[in-house]
Structures are given as C-alpha cells and as structure tokens.
Amino acid sequence: MQPSSNNCYDTGLREECGVFGIYDLDGADVSPSIYYGLSALQHRGQESCGIAVSDTSGPKGHVKSYKGLGLVNEVFKESKLEELSGNIGIGHVRYSTTGSTTVENAQPLVLNYLKGSLALAHNGNLVNAMELREQMENTGAIFHTSIDSEIIAYGIARERVHSKTVEEAILRTVKEIRGAYALVIMSPRKLIGVRDPYGLKPLCIGKRDNAWVLASESCALTSIGAEFVRDVAPGEIVTFDKTGNLKSEFMPVDVKKAHCIFEYIYFARLDSKIDNISVYEARIRGGATLAKTYPVDADLVCGVPDSGLASAKGYSEESGIPFGLAFHKNSYVGRTFIKPTQKERESSVKIKLSVLESVVKGKRIVLVDDSIVRGTTISNLITMLRKAGATEVHVRISSPPFLYPCYFGTDVPSNKQLIASSHSTEEIRQQIGADSLGYMPIEELQNMVGDLPICRACFDSHYPMEVPKQDISALLES
C-alpha cells in the first residue's frame, strides 16, 4: 500500500495489518468474536480498525459497518457492537502503509455495485499499485481512499460484473496485481480468504462449532475459542458458504515461495504458529545462534520487551549466562516501531520502558533485541541501563542489518533512514554506545525456520518479484 500526501501516495512508513473473518452457519451474531479476534491482532496495527457484518438470511447485500481511528477497545464500545448484528463478518486493524491516518483509509472497505455488495480487508502491499490505479482512473474509476486495498476491491467488483461467481472475479483480479496480500472478503453469502502466491503474508483457517474463521495469526483463533485447522496455502483461495464446506482453488501461477522472515523475527505474536512453525521456538533458535556466533563474558542476558525476550532466553540457554528481566514495560503504551512519526517513537520509549535498577546494577549485560532500524531506540535503552548502574552493555540483534526497503508491507523505511545502509557495524556500535554489537549473520537466518522458503530482501535485496527500480520514496518525491 503506497499512496502520497500530495497526490495518491504517501511517503510514510510501510505497515503491517491484521485481518479477521468469521461465518457462523448457525446464525449467531459474529461482531463480538471479530472484536476479540482483532484485539488479539492489535500488535499488527494500532492506528485504526473496523468491522463489517451482514446477515446471510436477511436482505442480500445489506452490510453494516463501522470503523474509526484508535485501538479496538477505544473504537468499539458494547453499544456499537450490538448495532453490528449479523452472522458473517470481517475485521481489520491497520498501521498505514499508504495514505494518511484518516478514517476514510480505515478498513474494511465496503463497496456497493451492480452485483450487490463486497467488503474487503487487506494485509500487505502491492508493488504495481500506482500503475493499476492510473489505468483504472483512465477508464473512469473514482477512488475514495488513498490505499492500494481499494484497487483490489475495485478490481474484484469490476471483474464480478463479467464473472459467474465472486471467486472467478477474484481469480481474474489477482492475475493483474503484484505484491504481498492476505485478504478476507465478504460477499452477501460467502466468506473468502486469499493469500498471495509467494506466501509473503500469513493467513490461517479455524473452526469453532459451526463457524469458520480466517485470521492473520493463530493467536486470534485461540482468543475466540476456535481450533486451528490449517494455514491458507500460498496462492490459495478458500471459500465458505451456506453448505458449511471449505472450497479451495489455486491461482494458476507457479512461483518460488518467499515467506516473510520478519513475521518470526518481530511482527507475529509469541503464541502464534505460522506455516507450521512456532514463533516462540523460532526466536529461541535465533537467540541460540547469536550466542554461538557472538559469545561474550557477561553476568546477565536481558531482552527488549516484547519481541526480544524469547531470543534473549535462547541466548541464555545456549551460553549458560542467566536470563533476567531488565525492564518493566508499561502495557498501556503502544509499540515504538509502529508509531507514525520519529518524534512519537522517541518519546514513547521512555514512557513505555523503565529499568529495574536492582537487576542490572554492577552487572555486565547482554541486551538482545530483534532489529536496529534507525538506532534511536536501542541507544536510549543502553543509556538507561548505564544510568541504572550496568557496567557493560553488549548488544545482540536477532536479524541481519537492514540495508534495503521492503515493498511488501513491513515497516522498513527508505535506505537513507536505515542506519546500517550508511554505517559499518563498528560505527553503529559507537553511535549507540554499546560495548560490543553482533547482528544475526544472514547465512544463519534460515536456521530460525528450518526449510521454510523465506523472503529476506530487506537484508540482501534479493526480492522475490520485480520491484520499483529505485526507492519508493525517491519515486514519490519526483
């Protein structure tokens, strides 16, 4: 998703979103389940959220929807959920990849068109969004948002007019789009899930009694008491209708799979399982690899909450250095990495974390974190540890240095904002004030996920598909 503030595409940070869908064949209202599912996916986006529902036994194509800026529990009060009655529905949490943070850009998107209604929620990024949008506008399309998700929704609606089924319209649309996408789509009588052929974005299937569920992560299934069935396969379109059966078909493409490694390093929740791999165990393995690669004499291994904790435990187990908690986290402050502006990121670090002085005073600390993007956050944490009496701080990072932008929806900014693109490891170590610094060797990255084929383009520029020839921010400034 890539719009700009002065026309349709924004030069801001890319996002990660969460999608959720449920179809209760017994006719029960699903909005409370969507609420809890989105709450479990809140870590994937904190700027806006939305829910769209319909009643499969009511007037065909009548969709009730509500969306707003803020967290799920801020936007949806009990009275609002009661208004959203229906037995089929989808939901979305957003951190903007494209478009400004306005309620117009919140999802799900709901379209009313010749064949009825369509609601869509999207996680991911299209690399040919600007090209497709221009083509559509030249044929009379009028867009109401600045997000590339509307391009997908409009494409499906346009193709549906000439297709026998919505699935056929989706198949025609995905032939035109390039990039990363996990979609949940609600037509008047169907719930549909779509995953891009590379498998870049996660999507899984669950079941609770007589209800089918789709979600970005398995933790959202657990939150509503649903059983995990399986992941949606890369390139698969799954449909649930009134028969209660799962219908599956695949896009007629054969590409090399490229699952986003950043899900396992940072984005996914610790209790999720994605493509048969436990996120927790992947991070434990990452920490163990760091301990083997960068041993150091130290008294305590600590992780940066939350995504650095499991890797720190893995480092501790492999090295034999005790694991401890160096920070208290204020749970009511959001994630610093997905704050919209640098100023907000910097100010929220100190509000979010405070050092446990009695734990670190007089000790040599190994501090494990998932990544260094700009270096500001880790520098602040090292300063806080030293002020609390830590004698040494050795930093270990469970990802390689970020060198290239991501075009597929992960919050990796342009090259000029990536500290590793213009500084050596030693220069970064000096700049952040660490006694030593070790990144995950890129050749060891695969160990986290076994034989799962991964995309690691933000580290080595080997993109799984053709991407813009120059950095997207440069394109937008021209």
Whereabouts are the PLM-identified features?
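Conserved short alpha-helical segments that host acidic/polar catalytic motifs at enzyme active sites
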Residues: 1-234, 239-298, 304, 392
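A conserved beta-strand->alpha-helix junction
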Residues: 76, 145, 150-153, 323-334, ...
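Flexible loop/turn segments at secondary-structure boundaries
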Residues: 97-98, 128, 200-201, 221-222, ...
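Secondary-structure transition/capping motifs at alpha-helix termini
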Residues: 141, 162-163, 295-299, 317-324, ...
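PRPP-dependent phosphoribosyltransferase catalytic core
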Residues: 174, 189, 225-231, 383-478
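Extended, hydrophobic alpha-helical segments in both membrane/secreted and soluble proteins
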Residues: 301, 308-315, 319, 323, ...
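Short, glycine/charge-rich flexible loops or terminal/linker lids adjacent to PRPP-binding catalytic cores
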Residues: 320-365, 376-379, 403-409, 413
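Mobile, glycine- and charge-enriched loop segments
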Residues: 354-368, 372-373, 397, 472-478
